[in-house]
Design a protein with these regions (language model features):
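N-terminal targeting or regulatory segments adjacent to alpha/beta-hydrolase or S9 domains
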Residues: 1-122, 411, 415-419
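Short, surface-exposed "cap/lid" segments of acyl-processing enzymes
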Residues: 27, 117, 121-123, 131, ...
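Glycine-rich "HGGG/HGxG" loop immediately N-terminal to the catalytic nucleophile
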Residues: 176, 196-208, 267
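Short beta-to-alpha linker loops that shape the active-site pocket of alpha/beta-hydrolase fold enzymes
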Residues: 193-198, 262
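Alpha/beta-hydrolase active-site loop
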Residues: 203-225
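Primarily recognizes the serine-hydrolase "nucleophile elbow" in alpha/beta-hydrolase
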Residues: 223, 229-272
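The feature captures the conserved acid-bearing segment of alpha/beta-hydrolase catalytic domains
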Residues: 266-377
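Catalytic active-site module of serine/aspartate enzymes centered on a nucleophile-bearing elbow/loop
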Residues: 347-419
Length: 419
């Protein structure tokens, strides 16, 4: 009890000292006056004054309110059944540790540890790149923190006219995330933090994440003024989930780039949990976090590019085998095969093993394999299958978390030769 008492005294002294210090600081008092005015008025001009400062967003007014759209499509997986014990165990697992494992970026401690870096990067975006910060209210009630950076005029191919919406991974933030890659190339970019990440409120359950993604898309069109066909969706890792869902609901987008993205989160979850808990994991995923990207991206028929990491350590399910076996277990491979089956089923029939063969080839061998001198029907079909693989997937020799080299970010084009 004595230790607890002294700890309480120290906490009171620390917070009391901070309060006194802030009230004596002229700049802080000026910020407080602006914050109170903005909170009371809700006017856009007051919000803009408030954005000169970096602070906890609790209590601020949103710059944009998303409109509920009843026509949006949602993936409805198979109905899962289970005993009361299984249901209860799965619910406990999801809320006790499952969500934290799936989305570590939403953990308070993780956010606190990165807060200094995020503030510095955010301020740099505004001061050095003329970033435009906006707070969006989703239909689920969450406040989503976003940053828009317009590309400079005079870029090749008028890239500034194309908006890249970046969808970060499970520990990614727009301040230090994938938006930097297309920004370096001159594209306009719109980054956003998922619910519970950085200054965004809420938690990243599927409904909240998709509502946030739709709010970002609505904002991009109605406020920033980009047409649907001028928007590229760029998802990294688990960010492929909201990116694919947006593509399914906004099919006229210019293209979709999925970097280090899996087909379905279930095999990855089961590979990292004890086999004795397999049933609990399956129920928990299907009932609470059914991130079945392969089923979602099937709704989209437009330009698509997958980027596979050759040194992938997160999306593999075989950690004990050789390098060849580990690479073969990369779930990006399964996503490619599913896309080929969906878009070009006539090419894959009886040749699915050839996709695995192509995935295992080095670049030089792929180039030779794609130009067979054999005119047989099977050889021609195999050659066209290899061409499809090459069109949809690019290899990047890097680990899962290494930033994507700008040279590998290419907006995909439609593939007309394989109808």
């Amino acid at each position: 009890m004595t230790l607890l008492k002294y700890a309480t005294y120290l906490a009171v002294l620390a917070y009391g000292g901070r309060l006194v210090g802030r009230t004596m600081d002229n700049e802080y008092r000026h910020f407080l006056n602006i914050w109170m005015k903005a909170r009371g008025s809700g006017k856009s001009e007051d919000n803009q004054l408030l954005k000169r400062y970096d602070f906890d967003l609790e209590g601020v007014h949103a710059d944009f309110h998303a409109v509920r759209n009843e026509k949006l499509w949602y993936h409805r997986g198979v109905s899962v059944q289970g005993s009361p014990v299984l249901v209860g165990a799965a619910y406990y697992a999801v809320h006790a540790f499952g969500r934290h494992m799936l989305y570590p970026g939403s953990v308070s401690l993780f956010n606190w540890l990165l807060s200094g870096s995020l503030i510095t990067a955010r301020n740099l975006m505004v001061s050095a790149k003329n970033g435009r910060r906006a707070w969006l209210r989703t239909t689920e009630g969450d406040l989503i923190d976003t940053m828009f950076i317009r590309g400079e005029d005079g870029t090749p191919e008028h890239r500034h006219r194309t908006l890249v919406i970046s969808c970060e991974g499970n520990a990614g933030f727009y301040e230090i995330g994938i938006a930097n890659t297309p920004a370096q190339l001159g594209y306009s970019v719109l980054g956003w933090n998922q619910p519970g990440f950085g200054q965004s409120s809420g938690l990243p359950f599927p409904n909240n994440t998709l509502a946030a993604a739709d709010a970002v898309m609505q904002y991009a069109q109605s406020v920033l003024g980009f047409r649907e066909e001028d928007i590229v969706l760029f998802g990294w890792s688990i960010g492929g989930y909201p990116a694919s869902w947006l593509a399914a609901n906004y099919p006229r987008v210019k293209g979709v780039v999925l970097d280090a993205t899996f087909d379905d989160v279930l095999p990855l979850a089961q590979a990292r949990m004890p086999k004795v808990l397999s049933d609990v994991v399956e129920y928990a995923i299907r009932a609470h976090f059914d991130l079945d990207i392969q089923a979602i991206i099937a709704q989209y028929k437009g330009p698509l590019k997958l980027i596979r990491r050759l040194q992938e350590e997160i999306l593999t399910t075989d950690e004990s085998g050789s390098e060849v076996q580990r690479r073969a277990s990369n779930r990006a491979n399964f996503l490619l095969k599913r896309i080929l089956q969906q878009r070009h089923p006539h090419l894959v029939v009886d040749l699915e093993s050839q996709v695995d063969r192509w995935l295992a080839m080095p670049p030089q061998q792929r180039a030779m394999a794609g130009h067979s001198g054999n005119d047989s029907e099977i050889a021609i079909r195999r050659s066209r299958l290899y061409a499809a693989c090459d069109h949809y997937l690019t290899d990047f020799d890097a680990t899962h978390v290494q930033p994507l080299d700008p040279g590998y970010f290419n907006i995909p084009l439609p593939f007309h030769d394989l109808k």
